[in-house]
Amino acid sequence: MRKNEMSTSKQAIQWKCLESKIESKRLHYGRFLVSPFKRGQASTVGIAMRRALLQEIEGTSITCARFCGVVHEYSTITGLQETIHDVLVNLKEIVLRGDSKEDIQEAFLSVTGPKEVTAGDLSLPPGVEAIDNSQYIATITQPISLTIELEIEKDCGYRIENLAKSGKGQFPIDAVFMPVRNVNYSIHLFGSGRATQEILFIEIWTNGSLTPHEALRKASEKLMDLLTTFLYVRGGDVSLFENGEDSLDLTKSPSLQPQFGDTNNLEERVLENRFIDQLELPARAFNCLKRAEIYTIADLLNYSREDLSKLKNFGRKSVDQVSEALWDRFAKELPDKKIVLNRRK
């Protein structure tokens, strides 16, 4: 391999946002470039990213509505222009952004007509907001009161509700938990000969509850969490079960032992490749750690709480934030005393 080909193959893969625009409150667009890849790598990444963007990112949606005195979804209410079915369809399309970790949250709609009812009239729980307050729900043509109790959930993908759960004015709603509306990717070659490499272009359209940049980040985190699982597999954990018989330890087979290798330090190697930006710390704490040359989770675990509190401009609050994020993200705790694993030189 020629010298210029060798240097090209060792270039770090980088990404760049080529275009970002808000076409409407409920339609955001972003186009990204990722390169350089070796031949065949771009399609692997493109396929995985597209599926993760469309299927793995959580969204918030209305999943159930309760009306007082309504028998079935095709009922009508005097003074309400739409049928109950039409109102349910409009509620399904309301775009919400939610940060709560609760399974089910309660919301309600209580208005008096005559009035055009929109998403801005919803009374939503803390941490949940409507992206477009002008989204249409119904029109009240007479001076009547309309009250609807709602359930809001956070999930992935598309959920078809069981209509058997309907009754007594309660109507499950088919929910779309997909912040990403569409994803396209394309691959282009550059270079020549053995130095030929690939550029991956990714286009993302979202419903406004996430920006394309946020969606790309979340999809990347989902893929990393999924694949990191394999790095934690130890030889002694691999077994085969068949027909309820005793497990067969594959690592005892001489022919298979080379496939497992030395797995004792896998966890340490994983942490060396997980960077502190994955803790999503406040800017103050993050910048203080970087100034102290703490770049990875492995670096961070070399410091006790007392050690961190001695860093410049790093107070008790910052230490608590780091400790909480470390536990939430990696189920790790700061050591009681300073230890040295693999400090960067």
UniProtKB/Swiss-Prot annotation:
Its EC number is 2.7.7.6. GO terms for biological process: DNA-templated transcription. It comes from the Eukaryota. It is an enzyme of class 2 (transferase). It holds the Pfam family RNA_pol_A_CTD. InterPro entries: DNA-dir_RNA_pol_insert, DNA-dir_RNA_pol_RpoA/D/Rpb3, DNA-dir_RpoA, RBP11-like, RNAP_asu_C, RNApol_insert_sf. The keyword Cell membrane does not apply. SMART domains: RPOLD. GO terms for cellular component: chloroplast; DNA-directed RNA polymerase complex; mitochondrion. It catalyses: RNA(n) + a ribonucleoside 5'-triphosphate = RNA(n+1) + diphosphate. Residues 266-345 are annotated as: Alpha C-terminal domain (alpha-CTD). Residues 1-234 are annotated as: Alpha N-terminal domain (alpha-NTD). The keyword Cell membrane does not apply. Keywords: Chloroplast, DNA-directed RNA polymerase, Nucleotidyltransferase, Plastid, Transcription, Transferase. GO terms for molecular function: DNA binding; DNA-directed RNA polymerase activity; protein dimerization activity. HAMAP family: RNApol_bact_RpoA. DNA-dependent RNA polymerase catalyzes the transcription of DNA into RNA using the four ribonucleoside triphosphates as substrates. Belongs to the RNA polymerase alpha chain family. The N-terminal domain is essential for RNAP assembly and basal transcription, whereas the C-terminal domain is involved in interaction with transcriptional regulators and with upstream promoter elements. In plastids the minimal PEP RNA polymerase catalytic core is composed of four subunits: alpha, beta, beta', and beta''. When a (nuclear-encoded) sigma factor is associated with the core the holoenzyme is formed, which can initiate transcription. This is DNA-directed RNA polymerase subunit alpha.
